[in-house]
Design a protein with these regions (language model features):
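Charge-rich, low-complexity N-terminal segments
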Residues: 1-101
Length: 101
């Protein structure tokens, strides 16, 4: 499995809140039964690398379907093939090291 961090930022003009669009993205992810986690600066999704690339395109398009004219999207994909990785593994590893020190 791979991990993708995605930040979809609809350019909403005068207003600054994009939470309504972020909520739509999370409704879509839930409907697709994808492991995902919202954090303050974006969303992390777990899946196969090829599926994550296709998903990124779909998530990028969602605000356009709501009438937004400009969307800025940032994608990071960690495609590790030497061992299985899951959502939360990196955080657990750091927390373990913090307990040791």
């Amino acid at each position: 499995m791979a991990l993708m961090q995605i930040i979809v930022m609809p350019r909403v003009g005068e207003g600054t809140s994009v939470s309504v669009y972020v909520a739509e993205i999370h409704k879509y992810l839930k409907s697709q039964k994808l492991a995902h986690q919202l954090h303050d600066m974006g969303t992390i999704v777990e899946g196969k690398a090829g599926e994550l690339w296709a998903l990124a395109r779909k998530l990028h398009e969602l605000p356009f379907k709501k009438g937004i004219k400009r969307v800025y999207t940032i994608i990071h994909i960690d495609d590790r093939r030497d061992k299985k990785v899951s959502l939360g593994d990196k955080v657990k590893s750091v927390q373990k090291r913090l307990r040791v020190s």
